[in-house]
Amino acid sequence: MYQKILTKDKDLLGINETCEGMGCVINLIKSKAAPLSVQTQRKCITSNFLKCSFDLEKLDPWFFCYQFNEGRYFAQQINKYYQGNTLSVKKLNIKSVGEVNIQLPDIQKQRLIGSIYRQAIRQRYLMIGQAENIANATFETLRKMEEDY
């Protein structure tokens, strides 16, 4: 669900700028959630996605994404749904997502957890980008060495 961050202007993940009050999008095929960003808030979504809106005083979007993507309690509930699914392609539907329960700590703790999750994802993608840059520089050096002999 998460894509490589290119620039602040192309922040499709919402890592730099989330759209406060806009909620999240759930990919029903991959069973992954991502907060809406300023860049994605007005985009049309297909039937493979579900747009979720919620009261920001009760549920933090990044906390929701953390619970949906990484939480064991969510995973157990989603796996129960998959066990009854005989399709070769496992896909969530609106009804199954609506039946999933979430345990909510107070909003301050949600915001803290959501903020840490957001930062961890940002760090991961920055590190992946750095590793790609190092690999590309190494390959370019090897090509130049190859030309010299």
Describe each model-derived feature in a short phrase.
Residues 1-21:
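Sequence-specific dsDNA recognition surfaces
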Residues 5, 23-50, 78-79:
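Short, ligand-facing micro-motifs at secondary-structure edges
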Residues 7, 12-13, 51, 140-143, ...:
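Charge-rich amphipathic alpha-helical interaction elements
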Residues 11, 31-34, 41-42, 55-58, ...:
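Short, charged/polar surface micro-motifs in flexible loops or helix N-caps
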Residues 50-102:
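Basic, amphipathic alpha-helical recognition segments used for DNA target recognition
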Residues 61-65, 93-132:
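Amphipathic alpha-helical segments
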Residues 126-149:
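Short amphipathic coiled-coil heptad-repeat segments
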